[in-house]
Each structure stands twice: as C-alpha cells, then as structure tokens.
C-alpha cells in the first residue's frame, strides 16, 4: 500500500526504494527493494523501511493450510489427473492378499542453496544483461523479457555454474527483480537476497 523511507534515508549509502506492486507469480505478488551503494547499506535500509503491505488473497496461507488443502484434494476423486490409465486399482486393492498402507509426510523444506539467490544486471545498448548462477536460462530469458515488456532478444543471460541450486535456481524471480531494479536505477545493480530473505522467498 505504501512505503515510509524516512528512517532509511538516515542511512549512509542509501539510494532509494524500488516498489513492484504487480509481482510476477501467484505467490510473489509484490516487492520492495532497498538500493544502496553497498550491500550493508541496502540491508540496513531494507530493515528500516516501513512497508504497509496489501497481503492479498494469500494472507492466510500457511504450511498447515497447504497441507489441509492437499489432503482434501487427495480425497476428492474428481481432483487432479491420472498418470496411468491401465487396470483397475480399486479392484486390485480389494482382492490383494497382502496390503501395506502408510502415510509418509515431511515438512516443507528449504532448498538451502550454497549461496543465497543473487544476480547482476545492467542495460547496454538497449539489451538487458543478467549475470548469475541459474539452472534454466531459457525460462529466465522469456520471463524476464515479459516482465520488462520487451522481446526475448533484448535479454541476455550469462550463466555461471555456481551457488548450488537443487532446483531453486530454475525459478526466475531473482532475474526478473534484478533486471527491473537495474532498469529503475538506470545503472548496474547486484541484487542479493539475505539468507533470511532467501528462506522467505524459497
């Protein structure tokens, strides 16, 4: 809804705040990014910004509500889809001499990349360049171009096999946000999720 920068402006090296109200996925529906001349200036400023969030339709989503919805959908014969359409599972289970029934659950897990999500972006001669460790640059180019409102040939991703991923680095959020902030700032930027932010946005 609004961002109060008054305390952040007292921090040496603070540049400003980039506000993205649209987001780019159903879950990530908006961001506020603190810009600083150094990482520590930006990190301190991020904590000093007072943001009045519009929490939207996901405001009550939690690990428990996700689990509850999963169980509800599993019990609904009309939800989901079938991978295998052969045989009669119900008949087979009914007539089986030996059966093993169990429920295995685990908590939602953090990917735990070796280094938090980060990227460098800058625009040169009308082309946005993004440098980072990423696992799916084809995906990242298309999504970043769409977020910037340009054709895919106006985005170049430079891939580094670094940082660990475990699947987390297939997501385009860090690329999109870094490119948007670079466009907003009109200068090269390095966007770094703190470890806490990395866990929050995983």
Annotate each predicted stretch with a short phrase.
Residues 1-202:
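Structural alpha/beta core scaffold segments of enzyme domains
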């Amino acid at each position: 809804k609004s961002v109060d920068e008054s305390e952040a402006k007292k921090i040496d090296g603070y540049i400003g705040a980039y506000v993205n109200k649209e987001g780019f996925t159903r879950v990530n529906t908006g961001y506020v990014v603190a810009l600083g001349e150094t990482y520590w200036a930006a990190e301190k400023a991020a904590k000093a910004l007072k943001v009045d969030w519009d929490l939207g339709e996901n405001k009550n989503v939690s690990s428990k509500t996700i689990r509850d919805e999963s169980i509800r959908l599993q019990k609904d014969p009309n939800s989901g889809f079938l991978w295998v359409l052969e045989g009669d599972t119900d008949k087979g289970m009914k007539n089986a001499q030996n059966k093993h029934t169990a429920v295995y659950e685990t908590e939602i897990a953090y990917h735990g990349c070796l280094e938090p999500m980060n990227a460098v972006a800058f625009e040169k001669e009308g082309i946005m360049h993004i440098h980072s460790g990423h696992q799916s640059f084809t995906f990242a180019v298309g999504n970043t171009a769409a977020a910037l409102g340009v054709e895919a040939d106006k985005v170049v991703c430079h891939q580094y096999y670094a940082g660990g991923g475990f699947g987390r680095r297939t997501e385009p959020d860090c690329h999109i946000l870094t490119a948007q902030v670079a466009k907003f700032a009109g200068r090269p930027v390095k966007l770094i999720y703190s470890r806490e932010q990395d866990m929050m946005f995983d």
